A protein has these predicted regions:
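Short, threonine-centered small-residue motifs that mark membrane-proximal processing/anchoring sites
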Residues: 2-9, 13-15, 19-25, 193-220
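Hydrophobic alpha-helical segments, especially transmembrane helices
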Residues: 4, 128, 223-225
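Enrichment for repetitive, rod-forming helical segments
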Residues: 10, 134, 228-229
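Short, surface-exposed polybasic-aromatic patches that bind anionic ligands, especially phosphate groups
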Residues: 24-199
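C-terminal membrane-anchoring or membrane-association module
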Residues: 218-229
Length: 229
C-alpha cells in the first residue's frame, strides 16, 4: 500500500470514529505555510465587526490522528496553538450554521478547483476566499463590497487578495464531485474558532480497504474485551 494512500485512509478512519462521538479533541500546531495580515469588515446580517487578523491554514489534528490543514469559518472566536481543545464536534459542512446558505457547496467547489496552496500567499488567499464565502450574503463574491469585505495588510501587497478574487470568480464554472467538506464546530460557551476542511471522496477500492481496516479494528477490539473478561 502506498504512503499516499495510507494517510487518507487513516484520516478517513479517524473521521469515521469522530462522527460517532459527542465531542472531539482538536489541536492546532501552527500556520501550515505561514500567513498574511488582512483587514476585515463584516456587516449585517452578520454581527457587525471590524478586525485585523492573520489569514492562513492551520496544521490540525483530530483526536490524535494524522495532521491535516483546516481553515477558520468563525471570525468571532479565537484559538491557541499547541493547546488541545475538547469542545469540538465533527459534522458535515452542510450541517454547519453558515450565514451564507450556499457556503458549504461553494467551499467544496473552491477545493475542487485544485489550486496549489503551498505558500503563505496561496494559503492566505484560500482562507480569505473561505471567509468571503462564509459571510457574504449579497449574492456575488466581491472582496471589496457586500456583507464581508477584505482589504489592506500584507494580503494586499503580496497578491493574496487578487488571488482570492480570481479563485472566487472561478466558482461559477466549477463543480465538485471529488471532495467531502467537513466542519469542526466548537460547542463550548464561549467556544473556539469553528473550522472547515475537505477530504477526497474515496475510490471504490479505497472504500474496500477502509472497510477491511475498520473490520480488523473491530475484531481486535472484541478479542481484547474477551481476554479482559
Amino acid at each position: 500500500m502506498s504512503r499516499s494512500l495510507i494517510a487518507p485512509i487513516a484520516l478517513a478512519c479517524t473521521l469515521s470514529f469522530a462522527a460517532q462521538a459527542r465531542a472531539d479533541t482538536v489541536s492546532f500546531a501552527r500556520f501550515a505555510n505561514g500567513s498574511q495580515s488582512v483587514d476585515i469588515a463584516l456587516g449585517s446580517p452578520n454581527v457587525p465587526k471590524n478586525l485585523s487578523t492573520q489569514a492562513g491554514g492551520f496544521t490540525t489534528s483530530l483526536n490524535g490522528g494524522p495532521s491535516f490543514v483546516s481553515y477558520c469559518i468563525d471570525l468571532y472566536e479565537y484559538l491557541l496553538f499547541g493547546t488541545p481543545f475538547t469542545d469540538y464536534t465533527l459534522v458535515p459542512a452542510a450541517s454547519h450554521a453558515f450565514t451564507n446558505a450556499a457556503a458549504a457547496a461553494d467551499i467544496g467547489k473552491l477545493y475542487a478547483e485544485n489550486n496549489p496552496v503551498n505558500s503563505s500567499v496561496a494559503q492566505a488567499a484560500f482562507q480569505i476566499a473561505i471567509w468571503e464565502i462564509t459571510y457574504e450574503t449579497s449574492g456575488a463574491y466581491n472582496l471589496g463590497t457586500g456583507t464581508a469585505m477584505f482589504s489592506g495588510g500584507t494580503a494586499g501587497t503580496s497578491g493574496a487578495l487578487t488571488l482570492a478574487s480570481s479563485w472566487l470568480g472561478a466558482l461559477a464554472t466549477t463543480t465538485n464531485n471529488a471532495y467531502a467538506v467537513w466542519a469542526l464546530d466548537s460547542i463550548g460557551n464561549p467556544g473556539h474558532q469553528d473550522q472547515v476542511f475537505a477530504t477526497p471522496v474515496p475510490e471504490p477500492s479505497t472504500y474496500a480497504l477502509m472497510a477491511a481496516g475498520l473490520l480488523c479494528m473491530g475484531v481486535f477490539g472484541r478479542r481484547r474485551a474477551a481476554r479482559q473478561d
